[in-house]
Regions:
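Alpha-helical structural context detector biased toward long hydrophobic helices
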Residues: 25-409
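Short cysteine-rich clusters marking metal-coordination/redox-active sites
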Residues: 4-7, 35
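Residues immediately within or flanking Cys/His clusters that coordinate Zn2+
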Residues: 1-3, 13, 32
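Histidine-centered nuclease catalytic patch
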Residues: 9-28
Length: 409
């Protein structure tokens, strides 16, 4: 009999749980940590908080889930028209445009632009357009009520006969994504907790306290810190897109810390135990989502843990923390020299930070320098690798800046 690490009840029906959730394209799994009931409950409550958070990243890189396909991610053309990014990075339109014109012989012509394979939406928009322009149809001697089924039938026949033109947009595509926030803390803590017990059930920690925080989200905010160091927490031999998890004990500082970096762009540190006196622990795991291959990383964790709050806690800004942040920005600016990122996204991103004058001043200094590094917006004809790398660096910056603006619930 196995014992569930959440409800502590014994079970014999094996349940395959993703330590890194399937919604994140995770591949690390276990069959002896959770009972079926807890596995299902956590999936519908805690893992559910990740829905939609990283869909744009997954779709742009065409990453595979073991179960299901990532839904389209919302975006916009530069003209403002809505579109979606499909799995694999392909953009499709989301709306229907109908233009009406008349020729010298007083014949009405409709020019319709619509997303492929969205017949219900197309028919609905045709009906709406004709009803809204019924006076114009009646002036041309057309009964608008009969016009609706006739137009729908005519469009349907053209589609069946392939008498339509297919085209890709030449407009740059614009999207916004926000990484971070307290919604990530519960699923990340669940990942670290399961990862620890998957490898070391002998480690003595307050399991009930961690389980309560995962289940309720209470008193979890001060456990987490966004890692804005210029150097990565996990080092790899190959360039890739990695999920990484690590755990390390700091016996001198009496701390047990967990480290998570999702997609190589959302690095977090969490305090599993603030008064740890158990055995030494050092665990690490990495998975390259581009090569679909597990790879053991070299860990680059902080050498000390006693100052972890002073160094990374941006809930209260100090001159020292601002210096660390400036160092990270300067490092990222070197990366931006080589890639294009959408200018409007950066303009939207660099919002005023009102609760600390020193931070606001730094933003005003940073914005012109960033804009000098920005070239034209990326359109959908750029090579996917280049577009992906630019997007990757933009996400790092976005998550880093969001650390200033996070506030407790």
């Amino acid at each position: 009999m196995k014992k569930c690490v959440f409800c502590e009840k014994e079970f014999d029906e094996l349940s395959c749980e993703h330590i890194i959730p399937n919604v994140l394209c995770g591949h690390l799994k276990s069959k002896d940590l959770l009972c079926v009931n807890c596995n299902n409950t956590l999936g519908n409550t805690v893992d559910k908080l990740l829905n939609g958070k990283f869909d744009m990243i997954i779709n742009i890189f065409g990453l595979a889930r073991e179960n299901g396909i990532t839904p389209p991610a919302a975006a916009k053309l530069m003209s403002g028209r809505p579109c979606s990014i499909l799995h694999g990075g392909h953009p499709v339109g989301n709306d229907v445009q109908i233009d009406m014109s008349t020729d010298p012989e007083n014949h009405i012509s409709l020019h319709i632009t619509a997303p492929e394979n969205k017949i219900k939406l197309l028919n609905m928009e045709i009906s709406k357009f004709v009803a809204q322009n019924k006076d114009a149809f009646m002036r041309h001697g057309v009964d608008y009520k009969n016009a609706i089924p006739n137009i729908i039938k005519g469009v349907s026949e053209k589609i069946k006969k392939d008498e339509v033109q297919y085209r890709r947009t030449h407009e740059p595509i614009r999207f916004q994504i926000a990484l971070g926030g307290s919604d990530l803390y519960r699923p990340i803590l669940k990942m670290v907790y399961l990862f620890l017990l998957h490898h070391r059930r002998d480690v003595k920690i307050n399991r009930r306290e961690l389980v309560n925080k995962i289940e309720s989200g209470k008193n979890i905010y001060n456990m987490f810190f966004y890692c804005f160091d210029p150097q990565n927490l996990f080092l790899y031999k190959h360039v890739g897109l990695y999920h990484s998890i690590g755990i390390k004990s700091f016996r001198e500082d009496r701390k047990l810390l967990g480290f998570v970096d999702l997609f190589g762009m959302a690095p977090y540190i969490c305090i599993l135990d603030d008064n740890y006196d158990g055995e030494d622990v050092l665990l690490a795991y990495g998975y390259d989502l581009l090569r679909n291959k597990e790879e053991m990383p070299e860990v680059n964790f902080p050498p000390k843990a006693f100052d972890i709050k002073d160094k990374y806690d941006f809930k209260a800004t100090t001159r020292e923390r601002l210096a660390h942040f400036r160092e990270k920005c300067n490092y990222l600016l070197q990366l931006f020299e080589f890639y294009s990122i959408p200018e409007r996204i950066i303009q939207d991103l660099l919002v005023a930070v009102n609760y600390d004058p020193s931070v606001s001043q730094f933003f005003s200094e940073l914005k012109p320098k960033l804009q000098q590094c920005i070239v034209s917006a990326i359109d959908n004809f750029f090579p996917q690798k280049e577009r992906g790398c630019a997007f990757l660096h933009e996400c790092i910056l976005r998550g880093m800046l969001s650390a200033f603006q996070e506030k407790p619930n």
